[in-house]
Structures are given as C-alpha cells and as structure tokens.
C-alpha cells in the first residue's frame, strides 16, 4: 500500500493519522458491513476541500478508484467518519453496491501528527 495520511480539521488544528498505523491498530477488529447511505463523505468535498481540482487530479482519483480492492475493509473513526478507504467507497458506489466492509474504532486514536505541513510528511513506502 502506498504511504498515505488521513487529515481532519479539528477546531483550529489539523489532525493527521498515518494510515499504515491505523491499519495495524485495526488488524484484529471485527469486520462489519456498513450501508453506503450512512457514509456522509459521499456527499462532501472529501478529496478537494476549499479548492477546484484540475482535470488531471480528477483522472488520478479515477485511477485510484478503479484500482481499489473492495475486499479490504474501510476504516471508520468512533463517530463513523472515514479515516481510510474513500476510493473503495467511491468504487462501491459506482458499482451500485448497497454496503461496504468496514472496521470501526470504539474510541478514535490520538493523531500521529498535529499541524504538520503535508509536504513535510514521509511518503516513501
């Protein structure tokens, strides 16, 4: 899996979770099915908040959606928000699935970083 991070605005701060770390934390979690209708991010500007994406950026996301493997569960925080797996959510929606496999934290873990510029994070595999 390519190195990636989950970013979330919390008050005035940006909380950042290392997705590899989230996957490790959830390895023993029970996998359940979640209705796509319950995934709020489908109706939000998830990948491009506060910006207008270029056509090339949209194409890159199409490619990631196409390559997404629905056999891997998405990761949800304690409140049911997506922390990992939005390309899988998009693929499931495009394929007209009613639900998707997911694991969910009972308590959302502390972020790995707070207010770190995304360009300063390690993206090497």
Segments and roles (model prediction):
Residues 98-105:
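Short hydrophobic/aromatic-enriched beta-strand-loop microsegments
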Residues 79, 105-107:
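Residues that form or immediately flank small-molecule/cofactor binding pockets and catalytic motifs
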Residues 50-56, 107-125:
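Amphipathic, charge-rich alpha-helical segments that serve as recognition/docking helices
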Residues 1-46:
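Glycine-rich short-loop/terminal segments
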Residues 33-38, 99, 115-124:
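Short, solvent-exposed coil/turn linker segments
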Residues 28-81:
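Short alpha-helix boundary/capping and kink motifs at helix termini
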Residues 79-95:
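A sequence-level detector for short glycine-anchored, His/Arg-bearing signature motifs
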Residues 2, 68, 121-123:
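N- and C-terminal low-complexity/disordered segments
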């Amino acid at each position: 899996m390519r190195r990636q991070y989950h970013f979330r605005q919390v008050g005035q701060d940006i909380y950042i979770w290392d997705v590899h770390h989230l996957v490790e934390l959830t390895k023993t979690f029970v996998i359940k099915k979640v209705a796509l209708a319950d995934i709020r991010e489908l109706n939000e500007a998830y990948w491009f908040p506060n910006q207008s994406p270029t056509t090339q950026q949209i194409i890159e996301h199409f490619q990631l959606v196409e390559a997404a493997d629905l056999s891997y569960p998405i990761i949800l925080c304690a409140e049911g928000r997506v922390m990992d797996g939005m390309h899988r959510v998009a693929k499931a929606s495009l394929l007209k699935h009613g639900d998707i496999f997911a694991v969910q934290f009972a308590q959302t873990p502390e972020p790995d970083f707070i207010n770190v510029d995304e360009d300063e994070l390690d993206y090497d595999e």
